[in-house]
Amino acid sequence: MKAMFLMDFITVKKLLRRYLLLLLGMGGAAALMMGSHPGIIPYFGMISVVSVAQALALYDDRRDWSRFRLTMPLTRTGVVLGRYAFLAAVAAAGTLMGVAVYLAATLAVQGVPAYAALVLRPGGFDAIGLAWSAAASLALAFVVGGIMLPTFFSFGMGNGPRYAMALIMMVSVLAINPIVNVWARPEAAPAFLGGLVSLATSSETLLAVAGALAASAFALYAVSCAACLAAYRRRDF
């Protein structure tokens, strides 16, 4: 697993610098408009995972690494676990980058009154919002990564993105629609969803809900890894 982790890092090492500059540019633009808003954080984790996963899959297809890699002292288990571990590290790094941008924007809002008068949210530091946004960033990254990696391992970069995007859209609809319905018509919401909403709106339990969200997404990521590993062992190269 360690060898595969290092191979993936070396493969996208130069691209990571470009992605870093791109994310900082996007984060800076978002901060200029939104100001001290922790809602900018979740985009960092998800965009980092999508960009790196696609770059690795494209590199595998162009260089035929999927076959050549098996002639090296690497097991199929190590290949799958190493890539999943590397993408998890990318998700964590992207989230930390988003946190850094949020903290910088918060300091700028507090230190530059002219800037604070222009942004949408000129408030101060929001610890609960920061924790929730960081958890949401990791959750989105793990869910998207858990969908993309099995499709890329099975179909490569040629057909993988089609299936991955279709699955991501389906999961998004299934996850977002209940939330929208509860927000629009809370009186008609099922008791289970109503209870979750009451927990999410309580500051005492919001941190626990955020932690549960990230843990659930990581569990899904682990299940995806196990399923991908089982399929990759049977794949005929």
Where does each model-flagged region fall?
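Hydrophobic alpha-helical transmembrane segments of membrane proteins
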Residues: 1-66, 82-237
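Alpha-helix N-cap/helix-start motif at helix boundaries, enriched for small hydrophobics
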Residues: 78-80
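Short helix-to-coil transition segments within interhelical loops
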Residues: 70-76
